[in-house]
Amino acid sequence: MTVTAINSLEEFHELINSGKRVVIDFWATWCGPCRVISPVFEKLSDANPDVEFRKVDVDEQSAIGEEVGIRAMPTFISFKDGKKVDEVVGANPANLENLIKAIASA
């Protein structure tokens, strides 16, 4: 499954309040660890079709990053029913996989 970008604060709110289970990768183009873990995130999206996988470029969509309190990149946050469920800060594949397993079974 292709991971698509969230392009507005409104789109972000619609997505997290849609009732879907969502995992968002908050990243930046200049972030080396973000580029390293991106293929892992893509692969996990293929393996978990019941979870919506999206990305937010924090430089382009700073309002979203500010709203959820992003302090470092990459940060992965899971949402369900409009609420934050969990987050992983840093390019840690094992922790990311655990976050996705947890939201997939929520």
Name these PLM-found stretches:
Residues 4-22, 62:
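A short beta-strand-turn-helix
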Residues 62, 68-79:
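Structural micro-motif
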Residues 20, 27-30, 72:
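Short pre-active-site segment immediately N-terminal to redox-active cysteine/selenocysteine motifs
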Residues 2, 27, 52-54:
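Conserved Rossmann-like nucleotide-binding pocket used by diverse enzymes
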Residues 26-39:
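Conserved redox-active cysteine motifs that mediate thiol-disulfide chemistry
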Residues 19-21, 36-56:
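Conserved helix-turn-beta segment immediately C-terminal to the redox Cys motif
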Residues 77-106:
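Non-catalytic, surface beta->alpha helical segment in thiol-disulfide oxidoreductase systems
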